[in-house]
Swiss-Prot record:
Entry GO terms, CC: cytosol
Active site: H132
Annotated NCBIfam families: ilvC (TIGR00465), PRK05225.1 (NF003557)
EC number(s) per entry: 1.1.1.86
Keywords: Amino-acid biosynthesis, Branched-chain amino acid biosynthesis, Magnesium, Metal-binding, NADP, Oxidoreductase, Repeat
Protein name: Ketol-acid reductoisomerase (NADP(+))
Textual note on the cofactor: Binds 2 magnesium ions per subunit.
């Protein structure tokens, strides 16, 4: 199989990278109706598999789980989760032949084996669904021409997909139809019904492409969403401790600081996050972020280039074939870091203290979000897609670190995201140690910026630069859509 993206000509590549349309609420007037009375069989019962299935069932769909014979015989976690929630469970041979829609929600590295197993069992004219397009785009999976291939990709972890649905809402979602596999022209109707069944239509749906989803998703998770948080955690902790800060305090400031800082980001973008700082601290955070962007731009661009060319995917798939040797070694190295093994701080840190003592962390967030967004847009990805794969998901990933440090983040994210995270962090940490960390001043981290006079013109210009960045404009628009839709959902 050949990388699908690399088989396209330049015009086709640009068209698919740039596919992105915010869908109107009235396009989902039929909600999940197109799939009512049809059989949906989900393969895989992890976080996305279970929680999407629960939502789909609550939306009136007929949902069952197809698991491997061994998983059923040995009553593994997937079997227990499905049966304990009252779902019908069977083998591939028992359930796939009757399915109108087979939804593959297994990990990326299992997709080829799963598709190879289920495709011969699927009835003519059935549909195959994904929530991430890696298998189609990067692996280049060839699917029978009578099968419709669609994607519904919630921009949140599976647990959030369920919790938002239970609140009467949903999570922003990308949907797509594979242009090589839409024989009956019903792909969009299937994708819309599936998205509505998970509640995504109540939070905002982008009509995208498999290519745009994969390339932007890989870029976001490797850089700002995971790689920057990992690199920032390790660098900031080591810097604090080297300057005499109590290790327990340093650990807590970082572990819970990302979540506190990005909560402001979620509510009001980079503008609100920066507004939480005093004026002298804001000016310093802005200056630090500009330095960071200049230093890290080539690294962000290299990751984007390797994602576009397929070099990243081929390297990772080679590690899959080698029993994940690199991934497992990097995971073990992370577990041995001083940050992961620091004692817990028993004292309290106020919400404002996380901002006042975390100026460098705020600068890292700002620089990482803007760089990821800019690099994606420069590569042909539309701004809305770039926003969802950078700023939007960051608070959700920061929350995992607040639970159990980097260990939890790397457990929750996919193996694909984890591999890319280590690639980025392993390059970013030495780069910033060499070119940036030694230039920090008192008040950048662990202490408050000393009070000082502020030049009005400088503050005006910095405020305008922050608020006029393109990600702030698109973020304001998309957060507005979500707020409006939530009001409609609650009222309804």
């Amino acid at each position: 199989m050949a990388n699908y993206f690399n088989t396209l000509n330049l015009r086709q590549q640009l068209a698919q990278l740039g596919k992105c349309r915010f869908m109107a609420r009235d396009e989902f007037a039929d909600e999940a109706g197109y799939l009512k009375g049809k059989k949906v069989v989900i393969v895989g019962c992890g976080a996305q598999g279970l929680n999407q299935g629960l939502n789909m069932r609550d939306s009136g769909l007929d949902v069952a789980y197809a698991l491997r014979k061994e998983a059923i015989a040995e009553k593994r976690a997937s079997w227990r989760k499905a049966t304990e929630n009252g779902f019908k469970v069977g083998t591939y041979e028992e359930l796939i032949p009757q399915a109108d829609l087979v939804v593959n929600l297994t990990p990326d590295k299992q997709h080829s084996a799963v598709v190879k197993a289920v495709q011969p069992l699927m009835k003519e004219g059935a549909a195959l669904g994904y929530s991430h397009g890696f298998n189609i785009v990067e692996v280049g999976e060839q699917v029978r021409k009578d099968i419709t291939v669609v994607m519904v990709a919630p921009k949140c972890p599976g647990t959030e997909v369920r919790e938002e649905y239970k609140r009467g809402f949903g999570v922003p979602t990308l949907i797509a139809v594979h242009p090589e596999n839409d024989p009956k022209g019903e792909g969009m109707a299937i994708a819309k019904a599936w998205a509505a069944a998970t509640g995504g239509h109540r939070a905002g749906v982008l009509e995208s492409s498999f290519v745009a989803e994969v390339k932007s998703d890989l870029m976001g998770e490797q850089t700002i969403l995971c790689g920057m948080l990992q690199a920032g955690s390790l660098l900031c902790f080591d810097k604090l401790v080297s300057e005499g800060t109590d290790a327990a305090y340093a650990e807590k400031l970082i572990q819970f600081g990302w979540e506190t800082i990005t909560e402001a980001l979620k509510q009001g973008g980079i503008t609100l996050m920066m507004d939480r700082l005093s004026n002298p601290a804001k000016l310093r955070a802005y200056a630090l972020s500009e330095q960071l962007k200049e230093i890290m731009a080539p690294l962000f661009q290299k990751h984007m280039d390797d994602i576009i060319s397929g070099a990243f995917s081929s390297g990772m798939m080679a590690d899959w074939a080698n029993d994940d040797v690199k991934l497992l070694n990097w995971r073990e190295e992370t577990g041995r870091t001083a940050f992961e093994n620091a004692p817990q701080f028993e004292g309290k840190i106020s919400e404002q203290e996380y901002f006042d003592h975390g100026v460098l962390m705020i600068a890292m967030v700002k620089a990482g979000v803007e760089l990821a967004f800019e690099t994606m847009v420069d590569s042909g990805i539309i701004e809305e897609s770039a926003y969802y794969e950078s700023l939007h998901e960051l608070p959700l990933i920061a929350n995992t670190i607040a639970r159990k440090r980097l260990y939890e983040m790397n457990v929750v994210i996919s193996d694909t995201a984890e591999y890319g995270n280590y690639l980025f962090a392993n390059a970013a940490v030495p780069l910033l140690k060499e070119k940036f960390m030694d230039s920090l001043q008192a008040g950048d981290l662990g202490k408050s910026i000393p009070g000082s006079a502020v030049d009005n013109a400088q503050l005006r210009d910095v405020n305008e630069a922050i608020r006029n960045h393109p990600i702030e404009a698109v973020g304001h628009k998309l957060r507005g859509y979500m707020t409006d839709m939530k009001r409609i959902a609650v009222a309804g």
